[in-house]
């Protein structure tokens, strides 16, 4: 990213570029991305996934502010599109659902994130043993209800396993590490595009539940 940014700076200092990022768990076979090794806060981290996504957005904000023709900081932010991610259900449907909900909350409370796209709506044989799809699994309802303001959705998302799977003893989202979390309703205060990608006839097509 730094090399590309430097070239753009040389070519056109006012060029408005943004970032598309795939914050998969490492390795891909793991579901509990918050326990991945080599993932920590700070620019010295070995890997960036959803757990420390703010390392990426903070770095971009600090090092690559949008500037006008005179080189002055405009105060505007670049944005990040999380254009592909997904979590394996091989470690349990419930854990996959918790990982998806947790990562969506992390994305939703990060003001630089403007899109959150799921890799697979259905399991794809081309992915081998990963089983990243959500159709017919707990993760489908988690994704469907995570930012739905209806009473049904709110009740569904209050299932405590969404928190305790991430941190034992947690009593709510406020007990997890979600930068910027303030308890506000995502659907009311955040506007974030979401869809799944369905593999069909050798192309990926958008599908919204």
Where are the model-predicted features located?
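Noncatalytic carbohydrate-binding groove/subsite architecture in carbohydrate-active enzymes
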Residues: 1-94
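Aromatic-rich peripheral "rim/lid" segments of glycoside hydrolase catalytic domains that contact
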Residues: 91-208
């Amino acid at each position: 990213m730094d090399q590309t940014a430097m070239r753009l700076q040389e070519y056109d200092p006012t060029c408005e570029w943004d970032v598309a990022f795939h914050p998969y768990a490492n390795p891909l076979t793991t579901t509990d991305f918050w326990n991945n090794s080599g993932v920590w806060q700070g620019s010295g981290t070995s890997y960036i996934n959803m757990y420390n996504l703010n390392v990426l957005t903070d770095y971009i904000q600090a090092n690559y502010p949008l500037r006008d023709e005179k080189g002055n900081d405009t105060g505007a932010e670049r944005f990040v599109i999380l254009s592909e991610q997904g979590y394996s259900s091989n470690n349990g449907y419930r854990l996959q659902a918790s990982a998806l909900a947790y990562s969506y909350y992390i994305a939703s409370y990060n003001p630089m994130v403007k899109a959150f796209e799921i890799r697979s709506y259905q399991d794809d044989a081309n992915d081998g043993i990963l089983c990243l799809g959500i159709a017919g699994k707990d993760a489908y309802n988690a994704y469907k209800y995570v930012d739905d303001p209806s009473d049904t959705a709110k009740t569904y998302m209050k299932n405590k396993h969404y928190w305790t799977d991430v941190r034992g003893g947690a009593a709510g989202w406020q007990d997890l590490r979600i930068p910027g979390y303030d308890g506000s309703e995502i659907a009311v205060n955040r506007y974030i595009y979401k869809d799944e990608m369905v593999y069909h006839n050798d192309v990926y097509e958008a599908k919204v539940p």
